Amino acid sequence: MNLFDGVYKSPPKDLIETNIKNTRENFTYYYSLFFSNILNDSKTDNFTTYKGNMLGYDNSAISKDNEVYGEYSPELFYKLNKLLIKNIKEYYEESNRFFFINAWNNYFEGTYLEPDERYGYGSLNALSKSLFDLPFRNSNYNLSNLNDKCLVAIHAHIFYKDLLNEIINKTNNIPIKFDLYISTNTKEKMEFIKNHTYIYSKANNISIKIIENKGRDILPFLIQMREVIDKYKYLCHLHSKKSLHDPELGNKWRTYLFNNLLGTTEIISEILSDFENYDKLGFIFPENYYKILKFTMHLDPREKERMNFLFSKIFHGYKFSDKYFDFPAGDMFWARTKAIYQIFKIDLRNDIPQEKGSKFILFAIERFWLFIVKINGYYYKKYFNYY
C-alpha cells in the first residue's frame, strides 16, 4: 500500500465567511462568497494541502445553531470544481492528485449532491462534467434546418401589458426565425401591444388578436393556435403571469420560468437542439419552482374529474391515472407540435368557466399536457438552467 502525507482542508472550516444574517441562533452565508474565499485562500503550508469543495447546505431543520449557505447553484459548483481540479493538476504529481467534496452526508442536512426536488440530478451532473472536463452546457448546436423555413412559433397571452417588454426581450434571444402570436383581451391593450411589438420584436411575423380572457391564458392559447399549429415544428407558450394574492412570489416564479425557457440564446439553442437530436422528445419545461412544490403534490378530486372529462373528449379507451405525476406548473413550456396537437382540435369554449368560476378545468389542462405527450409516443424533459 502506498502512503503519502497530506492534509485535506474541509470547507467551510478555516475560511473567512460573510454573513447574510447573523443572530445568536442563525448563521446564513453566501455560497458565492464562499466560492471567492476558497479561491483567495492563499495561505502557504509546509506540507501537502488539498483544497476541497462543498455544496450548498442548510441544517436549520435539525439544529438551533444552524448554518445556511444560500445562493448555491450547480453551475457555481461546477465552476469551482474546474478551478480546484486545475490547481491540483498544476501542483501535484498524477499519483498524488486527490479531489475532495464535502457533501455533508445526509439528506436532512440540506445538501444537494444527492438528487432532490429542487435540482434533480443537477449537482451530480455538474460534478461528473467537471471531473471529465466536459462543458457545463452542450455548445455544439446545429439549428440550420430550422432557419431555412420558419418552424418555431411563440405564443404569449398578455393580460398585464406592463410585462410586454419583458416578454419581447426574452423572445428576442431566439437565435433563429420565429413567428410571434400574441393574444390579449381588449382593444386598448391590442393597440399598445402593436405599437411596441412591431418596433421592438425580432419576430419574423407577428399576429395579435383580441380573445376573451376566459380560462386565463389557456383558452386564448388554444383558440389562436388552432388554425396555425400544423405550420410549425416547435412551439413555446408564455403568459404575463402575476399573483395578486402574493405579488412577490408571482414575480419570482414568472422570472424563473422566463429565464429557464428563454433566458439566453444558449439556453434556447440547447432546448431546440435537444428537440432536433431526439425525435421522440416531445415536451420541455423547467423544474417546478421550489416555492410552489407543495401545491403540486396532490390532485383535487374535482381536478381528477376534469382530467377524465378531457380524456373522454380527446381519447377513447384511455383511463386517467391519479398517481402523482409531473406537470408544468405555471403553464409555460416548449413542445413539439406533433406531441400535443389533439388538444388544439377540440372546442373547449363552453367547458372553461369565467375567471370567477371554478378553476379546476384550468388546473386539469395544465396537468394534461404530459399525458398527451406520452399517449402520442413521446417523452418529456425537465430543464434547470440555474436561475
Annotate each PLM feature:
Residues F100:
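Expand to "…catalyze enediolate/carbanion chemistry for C-C bond making/breaking, isomerization
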